[in-house]
Amino acid sequence: MKLSMPRFDQAPVLVVGDVMLDRYWHGATSRISPEAPVPVVRVEQHEDRPGGAANVALNIAALGAQALLVGVTGRDEAADSLANSLKAAGVDARFQRIDSQPTIVKLRVMSRHQQLLRVDFEEPFRTDAAALAVDVESLLAKVKVLVLSDYGKGALQNHQVLIQAARARNIPVLADPKGKDFAIYRGASLITPNLSEFETIVGRCADEAELVAKGQALMSELDLGALLVTRGEHGMTLLRDGQPALHLPARAREVFDVTGAGDTVISTLAAALAAGEELPSAVGLANLAAGIVVGKLGTAAISAPELRRAVQREQGSERGVLGLEQLLLAIEDARAHGEKIVFTNGCFDILHAGHVTYLEQARAQGDRLIVGVNDDASVTRLKGVGRPINSVDRRMAVLAGLGAVDWVVSFAEDTPERLLEQVRPDVLVKGGDYGVEQVVGAQIVKAYGGEVRVLGLVENSSTTAIVEKIRQR
């Protein structure tokens, strides 16, 4: 499946559901209590993170999308902590605060990255469903996707009012379902149960064929647009009306904590769909995101750079021949990791030992080496009729195979100046015996604070001489 990073900055999403505070107490454990056979934790650090629907909104904002959140809290310190964390993350949160009930808090006691105990502070909310629906309907005009993040805690009382209000505006509705009655999600565009939740409704599935059959029957019964079953180490299965099932393998390299993985899936789906991605691509991105988040400890969000790196790995674009858009994403990610970008360019028609030595020297000037390659038409203009000997695709493929080269990109102009303005390398390198000011593009690079370096050429190594020698034979 071909994946690319969506324009998340053009993706407004509204999340409605059960918000909660995930609270962590971290400490050291070195002895057993004399009062009971339990470890004693000396608490050294307190940490609060948004949980439930708030974590969904946080994930959406972390991807660079616009996140709006409607939920229910108490009027207490936990609600204030939630509000402050969400505001700092760029989430537009609108809470229905209830004086007589506490904000839901999940307290986890941690030691050496292990969870020793969880304590829940919660009561089912008695929500003013009509007032909440009014808040939601007033925000629908501002968003492209509605997410119902349902943990069965009482914030969502009348799902159908919200689903029908969104459908009337042609806004897709995504629901992360809970409980034993999925009929409350009737008419949703997509629901995302995990395997356990799915089998609670349809019964145990002996194999994938049975899962698909039961899933399709459930979709028909509830008038669902699509169904995504998340299956842990077995990946995900997407079902759509009239389309074959799409099975995606799990992408996690290491699993440390599955807390909040479902939130990550639905948030990435929602943001991608709001950005204009088709559903299969959005699911592919969500699968990658889930593989990242389970490698983190506790409730966590993933960032756009993290997802971008995963996409690049998936598409094989960590190295090799890239289009300009892919290259710019790769550069952005490299810079986020403090890497110095080096650029050089040429025709590289017949690769020889001089080229290899020069490119190794160029790579040594920084952390990542980009090679800009003249396309065929520009080589002909520069070198004359009969050149290039090798097409641009073949020239780039050979360069990409060198260990010194990270990324190869072509350009159509006679000089790389336009490409340099977009790439903005930290170091521009050319080989020759002329001064820095004579290097094409030097003024562009120096204008934004970059460096220009001239490296010596390997003697008796010239493509033109090699071509002429071959012709004389």
Swiss-Prot record:
Coiled-coil features, chain-numbered ranges: none
Catalytic activity: D-glycero-beta-D-manno-heptose 7-phosphate + ATP = D-glycero-beta-D-manno-heptose 1,7-bisphosphate + ADP + H(+); D-glycero-beta-D-manno-heptose 1-phosphate + ATP + H(+) = ADP-D-glycero-beta-D-manno-heptose + diphosphate
Protein species of origin: Pseudomonas aeruginosa (strain LESB58)
Region (Ribokinase): 1-317
One function term, GO molecular function aspect: phosphotransferase activity, alcohol group as acceptor
Gene (name only): hldE
Region (Cytidylyltransferase): 343-473
Family: In the N-terminal section; belongs to the carbohydrate kinase PfkB family.
Pfam families: CTP_transf_like, PfkB
Sequence positions that bind ATP: 194-197
Disulfide-bond pairs as recorded: none
Pathway: Nucleotide-sugar biosynthesis; ADP-L-glycero-beta-D-manno-heptose biosynthesis; ADP-L-glycero-beta-D-manno-heptose from D-glycero-beta-D-manno-heptose 7-phosphate: step 1/4; Nucleotide-sugar biosynthesis; ADP-L-glycero-beta-D-manno-heptose biosynthesis; ADP-L-glycero-beta-D-manno-heptose from D-glycero-beta-D-manno-heptose 7-phosphate: step 3/4
EC code: 2.7.1.167, 2.7.7.70
InterPro entries linked to this entry: Bifunc_HldE, Carboh/pur_kinase_PfkB_CS, Cyt_trans-like, PfkB_dom, RfaE_dom_I, RfaE_dom_II, Ribokinase-like, Rossmann-like_a/b/a_fold
Active site: residue positions: 263
Example GO biological process: ADP-L-glycero-beta-D-manno-heptose biosynthetic process
A GO cellular-component term linked to this record: cytosol
UniProt protein name: Bifunctional protein HldE
Keywords of the record: ATP-binding, Carbohydrate metabolism, Kinase, Multifunctional enzyme, Nucleotide-binding, Nucleotidyltransferase, Transferase
Enzymatic class: transferase
CDD domains: RfaE_like
Function summary: Catalyzes the ADP transfer from ATP to D-glycero-beta-D-manno-heptose 1-phosphate, yielding ADP-D-glycero-beta-D-manno-heptose.
Subunit structure: Homodimer.
Keyword Nucleotidyltransferase appears in the UniProt entry: yes
